[in-house]
């Protein structure tokens, strides 16, 4: 049973001058800020990442890049291409795509890593691209991994990647930042994977959805860098946009070891770079008055082995609850960017050779293994770890994503049960939708493979069964945004961008309105649909009454996690076609937010407004789409919103600050979206 304590609320204010580490890193990589502006959560900023990685999707990004009219990558040192997803596929079609990516990289002078060299995220870390206190992005959702080494890593969509290739920059809205304080020390044998699976379960009500997470507290120093990488990696499944660990002595020592092992003359792993990092680290720590949206705590010493599933990351239970159920398994997996590192392979090997001899994988069970990179596999071979795994009957796969993404050999078949040290167990992801998948640590996966059922390592090691203690954790909301009661420097408003946006609010009172509800999937791949038709089918899967309840110029208000689901850009463009200039929600899917701005649709997260409207209509008959007679005015120059009743000049019921929408972002909107902005920038530089 978990214990979550309720603690007092903290206040937060835009007027507070302190910055957290996330804001400091963004500040260092932002371009075009007005003089003296200090980046804060909510701000829309243009960013120039240190690096941008793409993998098998490099060719679609390249096609979009060329479609923008670009011919040369803006900064070849910024871009990294890796091949890691479908590396077992030897079909001519896939090999041709791989050849195209390699040729493009060679022509552009971009760093390229071929298939079977390793998973892109692992390469980014071990080759020193994702480096502490830098901003590194990738066109992949597990870019959060880089936070394990103190780099701010966050995903971008393909259009963003193409923009970075062409211009060196894209945009980002700085998310609310949640501070997660870790105390205590993990019990013997319990791993970073157990910690993040527990976090996903204990805080499984979207507490950190679309937040940047910063880990802090005395427990951090007791986690190895490999454990930090695992935790940061799965902050994606926790719902966060990044998961950042601090730069401390443990990390600096780890980098000194990497430098010692690196080939002489390595371009990025150098003693001088690590020394410079050590000098800079203190200044990049959070200020004492740094702002956080939430404060969470977790006592690591209260954890045990955790397993999530079946088919859900957020259903997490102690192994002591599952082991007695004798849940048989058919397949086990030790691989991926989550748990394919040397420490993970050694944890599994330690279970397999518990009594000095190598235990065999149970009859009828297939145990698949793959190192996160060729370098990791070489290290495992040199230490004898790989031989132990093979001697036990494990089935080796090449370094790559493979079964984790549902590609290649060893997928789950209908009726089968699998346990995996990967990051996602969504139904159908690792094979048949009629299979069941569980997630666990390498040690639990190995023990389960040996015994043929979900089992704790102690059952193989001959130790006492693990306890299932109450998890000691807490969460505190840090208050609402400050009222707009003080003077602030005016935001520059560009010609062609409205100084203020005003409209009547139309409430679509539902959480998790998905992209299929906004723009039906049956139209997604009909590229010749007229704008008028897009407007007519907008929101038809959500509410047929939306059409006659919403007029051009209205502002749509949605619930939490608006735009969840697929990455279809038409979810944004259909709303624009309907004449909606601005969508407000309690929160947005990150992909929808990016697609919205990239296609010139404005968005604002205003949970206080959503709460106000829900309270206003709490006793009214249910209505999916409701005209409210309530008006919102967004003063772009003042970075405030004002909500009034009856008319734009009526009774004021809400007035608060919002993030600054910088001139650089305004220019994207004025140019019709990110693609239009890139084309304009390329024309200007020609």
UniProtKB/Swiss-Prot annotation:
Its main location: mitochondrion. It catalyses: (2R,3S)-homoisocitrate = cis-homoaconitate + H2O. Disulfide bonds: none annotated. Its EC number is 4.2.1.36. InterPro entries: Acnase/IPM_dHydase_lsu_aba_1/3, Acoase/IPM_deHydtase_lsu_aba, Aconitase/3IPM_dehydase_swvl, Aconitase_4Fe-4S_BS, Aconitase_4Fe-4S_dom, AconitaseA/IPMdHydase_ssu_swvl, Homoaconitase_mito, Homoaconitase_swivel. Binds 1 [4Fe-4S] cluster per subunit. The keyword Metal-binding applies. GO terms for molecular function: 4 iron, 4 sulfur cluster binding; homoaconitate hydratase activity; metal ion binding. GO terms for cellular component: mitochondrial matrix. GO terms for biological process: lysine biosynthetic process via aminoadipic acid. Its cofactor is [4Fe-4S] cluster. Keywords: Amino-acid biosynthesis, Iron, Iron-sulfur, Lyase, Lysine biosynthesis, Metal-binding, Mitochondrion, Transit peptide. It is found in: Mitochondrion. Pathway: Amino-acid biosynthesis; L-lysine biosynthesis via AAA pathway; L-alpha-aminoadipate from 2-oxoglutarate: step 3/5. SUPFAM superfamilies: Aconitase iron-sulfur domain (SSF53732), LeuD/IlvD-like (SSF52016). [4Fe-4S] cluster binds at residues 337, 401, 404. Residues 1-17 form a transit peptide. It is an enzyme of class 4 (lyase). Belongs to the aconitase/IPM isomerase family. Catalyzes the reversible hydration of cis-homoaconitate to (2R,3S)-homoisocitrate, a step in the alpha-aminoadipate pathway for lysine biosynthesis. This is Homoaconitase, mitochondrial.
């Amino acid at each position: 049973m978990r214990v979550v304590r309720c603690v007092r609320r903290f206040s937060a204010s835009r007027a507070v001058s302190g910055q957290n580490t996330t804001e400091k890193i963004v500040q260092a990589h932002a371009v075009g800020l007005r003089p003296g502006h200090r980046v804060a959560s909510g701000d829309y900023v243009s960013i120039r990442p240190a690096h941008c990685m793409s993998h098998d999707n490099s060719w679609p990004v390249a096609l979009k890049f060329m479609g923008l009219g670009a011919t040369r990558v803006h900064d070849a040192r910024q871009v990294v291409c890796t091949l890691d997803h479908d590396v077992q596929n030897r079909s001519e079609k896939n090999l041709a795509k791989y050849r195209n990516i390699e040729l493009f990289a060679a022509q552009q002078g971009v760093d390229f890593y071929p298939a079977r060299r390793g998973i892109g995220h692992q390469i980014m870390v071990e080759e020193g691209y994702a480096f502490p206190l830098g901003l590194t992005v990738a066109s992949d959702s597990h870019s959060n991994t880089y936070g394990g080494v103190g780099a701010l890593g966050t995903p971008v969509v393909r259009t963003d990647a193409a923009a970075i290739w062409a211009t060196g920059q894209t945009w980002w809205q700085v998310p609310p930042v949640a501070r997660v304080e870790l105390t205590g020390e993990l019990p013997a044998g319990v791993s970073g994977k157990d910690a993040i699976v527990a976090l996903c379960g204990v805080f499984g009500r979207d507490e950190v959805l679309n937040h940047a997470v910063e880990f802090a507290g005395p427990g951090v120093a007791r986690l190895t860098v490999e454990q930090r990488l695992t935790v940061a990696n799965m902050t994606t499944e926790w719902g966060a946009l990044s998961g950042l660990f601090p730069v401390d002595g443990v990390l600096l020592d780890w980098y000194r070891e990497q430098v010692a092992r690196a080939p002489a003359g390595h371009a990025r792993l150098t003693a001088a770079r690590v020394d410079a990092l050590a000098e800079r680290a203190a200044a990049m720590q959070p200020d004492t008055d740094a702002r956080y949206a939430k404060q969470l705590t977790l006592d690591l010493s209260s954890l045990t082995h955790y397993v999530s599933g079946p088919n859900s990351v957020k259903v997490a239970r102690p192994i002591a609850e599952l082991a007695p159920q004798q849940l048989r398994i058919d397949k086990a997996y030790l691989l991926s960017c989550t748990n394919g590192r040397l420490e993970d392979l050694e944890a599994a090997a330690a279970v397999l050779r518990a009594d000095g001899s190598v235990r065999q994988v149970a009859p009828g069970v297939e145990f698949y293994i793959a190192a996160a990179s060729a370098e990791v596999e070489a290290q495992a071979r040199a230490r004898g770890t790989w031989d132990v795994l093979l001697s036990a009957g494990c089935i080796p796969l090449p370094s790559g994503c493979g079964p984790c993404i549902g590609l290649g050999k060893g997928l789950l078949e209908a009726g089968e049960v699998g346990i995996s040290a990967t990051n996602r167990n969504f139904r159908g992801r690792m094979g048949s939708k009629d299979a069941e998948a569980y997630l666990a640590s390498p040690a639990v996966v190995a023990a389960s493979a040996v015994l043929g059922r979900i089992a704790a390592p102690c059952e193989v090691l001959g130790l006492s069964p693990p306890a299932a203690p109450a998890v000691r954790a807490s969460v505190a909301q840090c208050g609402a945004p400050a009222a707009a009661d003080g003077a602030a420097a005016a935001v520059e408003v560009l010609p062609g961008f409205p100084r203020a946006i005003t409209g009547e609010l139309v409430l679509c009172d539902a959480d998790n309105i998905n992209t299929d509800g906004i723009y039906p999937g049956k139209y997604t791949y009909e590229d010749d649909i007229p704008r008028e038709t897009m407007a007519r089918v907008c929101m038809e899967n959500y509410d047929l009454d939306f059409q006659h309840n919403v007029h051009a110029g209205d502002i749509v208000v949605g619930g939490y996690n608006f735009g969840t689901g697929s990455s279809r850009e038409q979810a944004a463009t259909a709303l624009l076609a309907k004449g909606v200039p601005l969508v407000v929600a309690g929160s947005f899917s990150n992909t929808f937010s990016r697609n919205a701005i990239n296609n010139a649709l404005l968005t604002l997260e205003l949970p206080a407004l959503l709460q106000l409207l829900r309270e206003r209509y709490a006793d009214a008959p249910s209505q999916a789409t409701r005209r409210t007679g309530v008006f919102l005015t967004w003063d772009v120059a003042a970075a405030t919103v004002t909500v009034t009743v009856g008319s734009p000049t009526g009774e004021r019921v809400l007035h608060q600050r919002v993030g600054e929408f910088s001139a650089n972002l305004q220019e994207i909107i004025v140019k019709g979206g990110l693609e239009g902005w890139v084309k304009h920038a390329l024309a200007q530089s020609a």
